[in-house]
Amino acid sequence: MMQITEKYLPFGNWQTYCRIVGEATDRAPLLLLHGGPGSSHNYFEVLDQVAEKSGRQVIMYDQLGCGNSSIPDDQAETAYTAQTWVKELENVREQLGLDQIHLLGQSWGGMLALIYLCDYQPEGVKSLILSSTLASAKLWSQELHRLIKYLPKGEQAAIKEAETTGNYDSLAYQAANAHFMDQHAIKLTPDLPEPVLRKKKGGSLAYLTGWGPNEYTPIGNLHGYEYTDRLKDLHLPALITSGTDDLCTPLVAKSMYDNLPNARWELFAGCGHMPFVQENAKYQELLSDWLISQD
């Protein structure tokens, strides 16, 4: 049985919950950044075996605003920003003494990784894994609106009405959005691993404040996120992973692949937003081999 260590790291007046898989080795740990904002580390537990397979610690944490970390919803406008989440990431590295890391960001976590690398130029990041993520909020929204056109006409109309009026409470909209997310994120069925189905704590206000009411209407404080042209300056090895049916469409993934000087892209057939869940064994093997090759 692998060793699991749980810690609460002080972060200003708050605390960050951290979960460490395995014992320290001479290989750089893998640090995981979850999506959302506000999704919590839970689903990353399906990658625990990567610690053993690749001979290193795998470290995950709940970002401020969700999970077992502090949830300062009363300070949402100042707490739930890219700047604060980057400071938290820096604090996690500092508190745990993570001089050398491999960094994996899934969905919003990939945005956080790119903001961190482009704007803060940190040292000691050996490689980057961009899991179903994006370099442009605008392209992401455009692509998802293209996918919405494949929904039944009534569902398209419900989504359009919600976006036009700003009222996302109607049952018709909620049903349409749920259908869209079943198709392109992941359909939650009882046979999925427990960490994926586990009810997450908090996170909804972090999501609304940072991103917006849904995946395709980025009206939160990250709405201007645009890093496509900055990718050319990132020379570290980068592995992009995505699914054919992903919210991260092949065009979104290709826009990152084309602009990163040292990138590899693995496209998972038949997968949505979580190939690491839907093709777990294949994903673990890919990730472990990548980490070993980049040590």
Swiss-Prot record:
SUPFAM superfamilies: alpha/beta-Hydrolases. Changing residue 107 to G/N: Loss of activity. Changing residue 245 to G: 22.5% of wild-type activity. KM=1.0 mM for prolyl-pNA. Optimum pH is 6-7. Changing residue 109 to A: 0.2% of wild-type activity. KM=2.3 mM for prolyl-pNA. InterPro entries: AB_hydrolase_1, AB_hydrolase_fold, AB_hydrolase_sf, Peptidase_S33, Pro_imino_pep. GO terms for molecular function: aminopeptidase activity; monoacylglycerol lipase activity. Stable at temperatures below 40 degrees Celsius. It is an enzyme of class 3 (hydrolase). Its EC number is 3.4.11.5. Changing residue 36 to E: Loss of activity. The active site is at residues 107, 246, 273. It is found in: Cell envelope. It catalyses: Release of N-terminal proline from a peptide. GO terms for biological process: acylglycerol catabolic process; proteolysis. Changing residue 72 to A: 95.4% of wild-type activity. Changing residue 237 to A: 89.2% of wild-type activity. Changing residue 65 to D: Loss of activity. Homotrimer. Belongs to the peptidase S33 family. This is Proline iminopeptidase. It comes from Lactobacillus delbrueckii subsp. bulgaricus.
